[in-house]
Amino acid sequence: IVGPAPFSTTRAELRANADALRHEALVLEAMPDGVESTLPTKVEWFCFPDGAQLQRRRRAPRPRFRTFVMANAGQRTFGVCLQSHQRAVCAPAADGVEAERSLWVPFVVCLLTRLPIIESLRRWLQRVVWLLPADGTQTASPSLRDAITALLFEVPQPIPGALRVSITVPGCADARGGGDGDAMVEFAVPTIARLPPLSHRLWPLLRQFGPQALLELLACAFGERKILLHSSTLALLPSISEGLCALLYPLQWPHPCIPVLPRALMEMLEAPQP
């Protein structure tokens, strides 16, 4: 679980300083216990690429999903994030005036894996969104902890092209958002005898770029040109960049590829290599 570093502020300070709404992100809790030392370096930057930004709204923002990819020494780590918000407790302003809008603090439940099972993990998170803590503690509730523990230790790893794993997530809403019944989620890895398995779907790439623009992108990639993708929707960037790399098969992109670049790493855009 990733969220903003502890902070203390008043409503008057928030009204006077917009920067007070943005805080550095920290790993608040990791499961299983003791795994903090093996987490990828600065994984919290990728959970909150633009920093942990508080929001002033009358109602809580809707939960949002996003993904990221980290590479180190040829090993790729996929991250699937579910961002939700909790109401913050603010110290009263000196003038005693209460703001009409509540202050909402973001936190992220992030699942890390080296298997290309992004969509399966996304569906799993969609089922457990109802288990997120609602008391403002920003720690895993007992029900959420039990669900994550079962996913980590009781589910066998799928075998490419041979073993598909289906698990039941109890006590969650069904696909229509109603009820309180069980939900089934399937994990599968394609066989290695075929094309490399895709970590993301190709349709966002095909939808966002027409044939001409896609051909120009592929020409730049084959020519090892620097490619910078910008979008106001962070969830699109991993799908587009991973899809573009997949279309290079049987060749591979030999240079660093960061689908979502955190604000803290912006200086990497000045690097001379692609």
Describe the predicted segments one by one.
Residues 1-274:
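UDENN/dDENN subdomains and adjacent acidic, S/T/P-rich linkers in DENN-containing trafficking regulators
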